Amino acid sequence: EMAGKATVSFDNLGSVIGEKVGNKNGPKIMVAGHMDEVGFLVTTITDEGYVKFTPAGGWWSQVMLAQQMTITTSSGKEVRGVIGAKAPHILTPEERKKPVDMKAMYLDLGVENKEEAVKLGIKPGDMITPFIEAIALANKKYLLGKAWDNRVGCAAAMEVLDDLKDHDNIYYAV
């Protein structure tokens, strides 16, 4: 989207940097956004084929159970699963009063054993991200989706780049 609007470069971390110079001696201004999102990393696959994971970013365990997730393998293949834990009917009365510890959760892929999960290309280190369809809610000006805070920053940086005409700055969209 920056092509033709700014000089584009890349850094060693994978950032895309657009530079638009109005006055080469003018002040430098940057609007930065980021496209990352919170998720998980595969740590192990159990003999039963369940995927154990560790968080990448901040998560609140109370909202995780029954959430659909996507594992992206190193080859780019996407495998869908759902977060599960010990069934409520086998929890002790004391366990039912507490949030489920994230370490007790797993991703259920609907496979019968570890071998089936491995055949799907899943291995430790693969990323796991929430599967959430981006949709408009009942009032169409309200949207549901994941990582909006991240993507809005990128959109703002691009919008400023689009709207910037004559200026005395060095503008960076990162």
Report residues per predicted region.
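N-terminal hydrophobic/helix-forming segments and targeting peptides
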Residues: 1-174
